[in-house]
Amino acid sequence: MDDLKIVFSDVDGTLLDSRQEITPRTLRALKLLQKKEIPFVIISARSPSGIEPIVRKYGLRCSIVSYSGSLILNEERQIIYHRGMSRVEAAKILDFTAQQHFDMAWGAYSFDQWVTPDRTDPRIEREERIVKATAQQGVIADMIADEVHKLLFICAPAWTDTIEATLKAQFPQYEIVK
């Protein structure tokens, strides 16, 4: 461990196990990193508010890379980097998906704000439970900033490939992943 300069970790399935917990062995390793003053960075597609409960619960001191790199915060949670699409562009994508009549729920993320048109949708409620964060009922126009870092579409697994392919074909300028 003495030759390590920095350690990066994804959250789901890497840092957290299937029960959404850090194992005792992993936690010991993280505490050793802190003791040796080796920087630890959490990287996730989650929002900052979806990462912070983990940081607080386990007493971690780390920078975070959220939205798969669209927003980077240092240990003091100051913004180091951010890049997203405009609300207008996000609205175009959402309008397109509405015209397709896809059976899905969506959430839009800007810095640490998460909006969705229906907080009572079971798919959104499940996401809230997983990330231990709360969505705000609203639409893109309700977002405080003009920068959208992530659009999340939640659908039945049988629809995922179709929706992904359709969005990639219509919006090749954006990174669309499942």
Descriptions of predicted regions:
Residues 21-123:
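Active-site phosphate-binding/coordination module
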Residues 6, 63, 151:
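Short, Asp-centered acidic motifs that coordinate Mg2+ and/or phosphate
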Residues 103-178:
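Conserved acidic, metal-coordinating active-site core of Asp-based
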Residues 3, 59-60, 147:
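Short loop/turn motifs at secondary-structure junctions
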Residues 3-19, 93:
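Asp-based phosphoryl-transfer active-site loop
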Residues 9, 71-74, 142-146:
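Short, basic/glycine-rich phosphate-binding loops at helix/coil junctions
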Residues 2-3, 37:
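Short loop/turn elements that form and flank the Walker-type P-loop nucleotide-binding site
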